[in-house]
Amino acid sequence: MERRTFLKSAAAVSAFTILKPVTAFGTKANSAIRMGIIGCGGRGTGVISSISKNTNIVIIAMADLFDDKLQKALVTLNKVNSEKGYPEIQNTNMYKGSKAYLQLLNNKEVDAVLISTPAYAHPEFLEAAVAAGKHAYCEKPAAIDVEGCKRVQKIAAGIHGKLNAVHGFQIRYASPFIEMINRIQQGAIGDIVNVQLYYLSSGVGIGPINNMSFDEYRIRNHFHFHAISGGTLLDQGIHIRI
């Protein structure tokens, strides 16, 4: 499927459905879906690299609050593009600061975006992406509180099949897990009377404050601040519940 065909076909797809890898494959250089990434930390860089390896995209734009995140990710993403014969990301398509996401979304060359920021920003950034007419893959969770989730529901209701948008609950769409759930529901292992779940982790490290402001310190270490992360139960619950 060529890029233009994919973009036109979005009208036939319901809001917040998963985009299957085969949907994005193309056979010509100009058929690649042009993607931008909002939030260039380790998670975002890893996810968009994986998308590139499994689908026909070219990464053309980056946005982040911090320059060091941009520069570190740039090395990886230029390599990802190079491996597929695509050009490096232009300096003019690198956006830094609190309005960086809006600048990227205003880039007419961008077809779709990956939103991989701290969770508190997901509703706002997703809303802006949809308003800009961009297809979006937004990392989980949808939001950190009930009001944020209601906001996301409203965003989804307003898409009306015009865009492809999905949250990163990839386990829900993975064939092995779908088959497992189907077999359980069909009684393949009998009646389930008890389920026990265990999760062991060393936790997320917290960085030094150095000379940064408290706001910057809090955002860089957002997992340690419930007000902008939702807390451990939310962050881990979205991973271990299927």
Enumerate the predicted regions with their spans:
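ADP-ribose/adenylate-binding Rossmann-like module
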Residues: G133-D145
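N-terminal glycine-/serine-/threonine-rich beta1-alpha1-beta2 phosphate-ribose binding loop
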Residues: M1-K134, R151-N164
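Predominantly a Rossmann-like dinucleotide-binding segment in NAD(P)-dependent oxidoreductases
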Residues: G39, G158-V166, I171-I242
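Soluble or luminal CAZymes and related metallo-dependent hydrolases
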Residues: K69, K96, G148, R172, ...
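Glycine-rich phosphate-binding loop at the start of an alpha helix
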Residues: P123, V146, A174
